[in-house]
């Protein structure tokens, strides 16, 4: 009735009820219980049945990865900026009749995979083929950590817990928590009061038994934030030299680079080349300001690029190169069909003409596609003039997470096979995995750009030891850093990282199953096989691919434990956001409002590769 429609209005707006075509009956009949949040019947589109019987009769589409269709990459729309279903949109029509689950080549996986005994905490194996890889019984070193609020972590060095938060497993009362955060209270209060004009709501106190509909209704729909300069954080005037910047940084970069070419300027930093560059202090150190311009991607050759919407950031895989150096091609760039030193990403339209120029006879592998759709790094726009108090740091992290979630949804919708799932299943998987994806990407950035010594949330928001303690989540920060250190120890490759991230997207499901559980299981097994195939082809493994697979899947299981503690802390600050003065953007309000009651009621079920 009206109550169900109100509770799902922002997530399933594109779903049309049809009493004659109930979608859930096309999967396993009535054996799979539907999620109460999506209990309305789903209209089944003709020629778009992602769970048709053809999947189980062995028929496959001629081209399981239809990347020649331009609509497949048409994900740069801004419709409903803060809604998951608005970004995901209705199912695309370019996927054809069949599900692309069998599109992964498994020629090198003819040997049967040994499975672990069935257990309630493992990946469901009912009605699965014998080739389904759901875990391994293997010897070797275990990298399974119990991290964060509800346990301890084994680190190479002892942990010095923050004295104000020695036991996060039993959160302190609200009054004592507020008192411990009120260092420099007057300055922090003035800063926060001025920052509430940025369009992001501050939810009030939320009781334990409040429904997701009421949770979501407490937030107001904010206007989309304006563009900010990626160098100093001031209001941007346009896209200058390929990067969204203000007029001051535009003029500075032009004069600095042209003067450097003519040897009129030779900037030197009086400190350690790590000066803070913001709106107030941008003129203090020209050397660090120029360095930040180059790191943001400014280039004199891009002066003709005037479109404001094309924001250029720092890419995950390639470190920043000085402007005067000539980029050299690497083997990875040759195999990913790119023509420049920078890989295309989910925020770039450059991939569309590249894919269109490829001969239709060429079928790209899933691993290559994942490398090309990987999102770029998002800037936090952190105000370095404000004090590093817990409320300021956590509010900035929440706003950054809201921006990253928009990228995560756009990334998910172009993952091969994901759009073949019902819209409700897509939304459910994103809601259950958003924290896992964010922390996993954070560990990768910290590994690539900070040598795992700091937490690289954004180029303008990096957590050192002091900021970790100030954030009131020191133990959790240490846990995320430990994952990054494992990346460094294992020398994780970008190809492995992208495949593991997809598996994390597919690693938490409702206990009663998804709307189309069979399609989900087929997709997950295919990506596990793809990871195995990548490990077999890697020359660095030299016959030790199973040991490598064991280590990587152990690391994925460790992420589940870490994320459980991160969610507990996130839900706590969400409920106490008004008292703690922690801001949440509307995107996170929507996701957490729907996720919180499901997780706390035990509906969510993590899928592990190994016995706990």
UniProtKB/Swiss-Prot annotation:
Record-listed 21-hydroxyprogesterone binding positions: 398, 404, 445, 573
Keyword ATP-binding appears in the UniProt entry: no
Residue ranges: DNA binding: 229-298
GO BP annotations listed: nuclear receptor-mediated steroid hormone signaling pathway; regulation of transcription by RNA polymerase II
Segment forming the signal sequence: none
S-S bridge residues: none
A cellular component term, taken from the record's GO annotations: cytoplasm
Gene Ontology molecular function, alphabetical: estrogen response element binding; nuclear receptor activity; steroid binding; zinc ion binding
Residues that bind progesterone: 398, 404, 445, 573
Zinc fingers typed NR C4-type, residue spans: 229-249, 269-293
Pfam families found in the cross-reference section: Hormone_recep (PF00104), zf-C4 (PF00105)
InterPro entries xrefs: NHR-like_dom_sf, Nucl_hrmn_rcpt_lig-bd, Nuclear_hormone_rcpt_NR3, Nuclear_hrmn_rcpt, Znf_hrmn_rcpt, Znf_NHR/GATA
Region (Disordered): 310-348
Protein name: Mineralocorticoid receptor
Biological source species: Xenopus laevis
Gene encoding the protein: nr3c2
